[in-house]
Amino acid sequence: MTREEVFQKLNSVFQDVFDDDTIAVCDETTAADIEDWDSLEHINLMVAVEKAFGMKFSMAEVTGLKNVGEMVDVILKRQ
């Protein structure tokens, strides 16, 4: 899977989790950029991403990711 394909899939996941079809994530996207992205939604998002990509994040990754680009890096390493 390419980086671009990961972003396409992540866009769908983010749109579903946050119920907002206008969301388009990029490397620099953070929780501050998405209105409803709080700590509870972060957990829901991580579970949805894990399910979409058939992988699991470590607790350190769940709490340590600073932006979507870092999330993509982890996903690509696990593919």
Predicted regions and their residues:
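Phosphopantetheine-dependent thiolation modules in NRPS/PKS and related acyl-activating systems
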Residues: 2-37, 41-47, 51-79
